[in-house]
Amino acid sequence: MVWQGLVLAACLLALPSVTADCLAQCSLCAVKTQDGPQPINPLVCSLECQAALQPAQEWERCQGLLSFLTPFTVGLNGKEDLKSKTVLEESSSEPAKHIRPYLKELEKNRFLLSTPAEKNALSSSLVEKLRGLSGRLGEDAESELMGDAQLNDGALEAEARDSNEEEPKEQVKRYGGFLRKYPKRSSEVTGKEAGEGEGGEVGHEDLYKRYGGFLRRIRPKLKWDNQKRYGGFLRRQFKVVTRSQEDPSAYYEELFDV
């Protein structure tokens, strides 16, 4: 009785896995033959797979279809594996080319060296070489990045320089369309020197006539004693003394004498 119970329990435990396999295979066969003239019924196929129905025509057809499809699936999986392997080999080929000579040297000298001190010295030298190689590879990548960054910075500087050169051209043209640069007048220089020497008095400023494109220097006012402004008859060399500058007491004395 005990053996019979154990066999029954093993059969019950094995049934779900067998059922799942049959359903998966029959479903695949049904999908492959659904557009054909005689599609496979997945329910009948699964029952025949479990030996619940006789004869097993649908299951035999499904087995023939699966045996025909398995070589192609295996070939496709093999091609995908080969592609992945080639990609990995190509990605790791460049560092391997540089490191391979050092590994060969290590394997060759492993049998020649007898003392552990020599082995340690050789291993340390190889480690330093490998570190230098990895540093050079990293520096090459960094140099490429820095070169690209410098090119971008150079382009930006050139654009900024062009914009600065264009700014004077965009200035507004004044007074007849000419923008001229005039030198400093000597009178301004002398006026500044006189102002510094006499306590801040600034000399006369040059006047500029801006409406015709001409720059003219206006003379300062003539310091005459009495200047007639309407006809220009009174001039500097006549030495006319005005009445306001005379002594008023002398005028009153003349009146009293009369």
Swiss-Prot record:
Entry keyword annotation includes tRNA-binding: no
Residues making up the propeptide: 21-172, 186-208
Function: Leu-enkephalins compete with and mimic the effects of opiate drugs. They play a role in a number of physiologic functions, including pain perception and responses to stress. Dynorphin peptides differentially regulate the kappa opioid receptor. Dynorphin A(1-13) has a typical opioid activity, it is 700 times more potent than Leu-enkephalin.
Name of the protein in its database record: Proenkephalin-B
Post-translational modification: The N-terminal domain contains 6 conserved cysteines thought to be involved in disulfide bonding and/or processing.
Record localization: Secreted
Molecular function per GO: opioid peptide activity
Signal sequence coordinates: 1-20
InterPro entries: Opioid_neupept (IPR006024), Proenkphlin_B (IPR000750)
GO cellular component: axon terminus; dendrite; extracellular region; neuronal cell body; plasma membrane
Alphabetic keyword roster: Cleavage on pair of basic residues, Disulfide bond, Endorphin, Neuropeptide, Neurotransmitter, Opioid peptide, Secreted, Signal
Family assignment from sequence similarity: Belongs to the opioid neuropeptide precursor family.
Taxonomy, superkingdom: Eukaryota
GO-annotated biological processes: chemical synaptic transmission; neuropeptide signaling pathway; sensory perception
Pfam families the record matches: Opiods_neuropep
